[in-house]
Amino acid sequence: MYVNKKNMRRAIILFSILFADFILLLLNCFEQLEQVLIFTGGYAIGTLVLTECLLYKTTSKINFFLLFVGISFTFEFGQSMSVFLGGYNNMNPIWFLNINSGFFNGKEIWEAFFFMHMLMMSFAASYIIFYKDNLQINEERNSIITVVSQKKLKKECQIGYFLLLVSIIPTFYMLKKDIMTIQIYGYGATLQATSGGIEKIFTLLSEFFPISVIWLLIYEKRKQRKLMILLLTFAYMFLQLVGGSRIQVFRFAVILFLMYSLYYKKINKRNMIFLFLAGGIGVFVLSLISSIRTMIYTSSNLSELIQKAAVDLWENNFIVETLRELGNTQIINTLVYKECPKVIDYAYGTSYLKMVFSIVPNLWGGVHPSSIDVDSIFSPLYSKTTGLGSSFVAEAYWNFGFLSIIVCFILGKIFTYIDIGLNEVCKLGVKDNKLKAYIFFYLCFLLIFWVRSSCNGFGRSVLFAAVPIIMNKITIK
């Protein structure tokens, strides 16, 4: 296997950081909570910038993995980062979703941070080692342009519109339900809500919404139709924010960016500045909606709430506030590291096998085997009222303990195949292989969820994603 020497030197830098993580984990330099959060926050920001620079040097583009690592750091270490940037006083210890609520001491947060950081470094180093630009490998393929008949393209678009029609009402109904739950009972109620009957069917049908959007953005050539799909997607993203789901917004934002920067090449260096400004506004809106959600019980006057929330965010640094809220995944990471295997035994890989179980419908009633994940096992140790979610690093540690460093190294290699595949379908001429493009973009959409969740439901999601492919094979011959 050929390994680029420059890539190996970059990977060695990350392995050096991994070794430094191990030394710092053993040393326990600080015990006071404030000092721990400030140090780990500065460390996370510094290593994030360095890692992203090394990844960009490796790939020469802003690709899926670079975005995945950036989002991962924001979620996995966000609360430490918010303390470093905004000060310890910005973390209210009364709020149970803040890591300084009193459940963990400084030593526990310190050790969990540096071990999870080791996993991130192993993950990124592996990617850099195995990544290769497939420009020369696919040179012959790029010269082949497939002629797609208009009749075939029309049928492929019809598949996407059919799935969109099937899913649009269930999707927006469930979003409306979440928003109404927040207005009446508060945000925490959406985290505890369960569905049954028609709502369970609606939840399943809503799986087709992102699938149909990705499919149509690839197959639909008419600009007005594509604009309609984009407006529908932006409406969905906005309502997801109001309903409390930030990770769904990140998933669509990443996919839209990848499609329009790599696949359609509509985003270049000149309009990248505008994109960053739009991103900053988006972060402010995210924080604003989050603040309104938490303050909604204090007033029924919406304009008054928006004004008060906007002023508070501007005065208290909305970026710090966003990091604090997104970074509560750091709590589940710390909890898993603290309680496993002392209270909860290792899963020994069974967590990953549950992806297969999620394909089988729950015909026998009760708890579905695939629903037993990091969140359901560990969250009750911290809070009896709400779930804490999960992350791919927490899941790796729960399964294999210290061997999860090797697991994350393997995951890094797997992610290289996704980006190499994306490179291939995004090259001129190969764009005609739309089915392959759909598969890779959907995989990206699916994997982003792993930043904030376990992979136990991935099997079912892949099964749903296969539906338009099967329909395509049946209807088009």
Residue locations for each model-derived region?
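Hydrophobic, membrane-inserted alpha-helices
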Residues: 19-24, 46-48, 208-214, 231-239, ...
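N-terminal "leader" segments that precede or initiate the main folded domain
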Residues: 1-143, 252-287, 453-477
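Hydrophobic alpha-helical transmembrane segments
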Residues: 104-124, 196-211, 318-329
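Hydrophobic alpha-helical segments
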Residues: 385-477
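Small-residue-enriched transmembrane helix-hairpin modules in multi-pass membrane proteins
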Residues: 187-195, 283-411
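Membrane-embedded catalytic interface detector for glycan/lipid assembly enzymes
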Residues: 34-36, 95-103, 131-268, 279-298
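Hydrophobic, aromatic-rich transmembrane alpha-helices
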Residues: 46-52, 209-221, 407-424
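Membrane-interfacial loop-to-transmembrane alpha-helix junctions, especially the N-terminal start
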Residues: 5-15, 59-72, 157-160, 223-230, ...
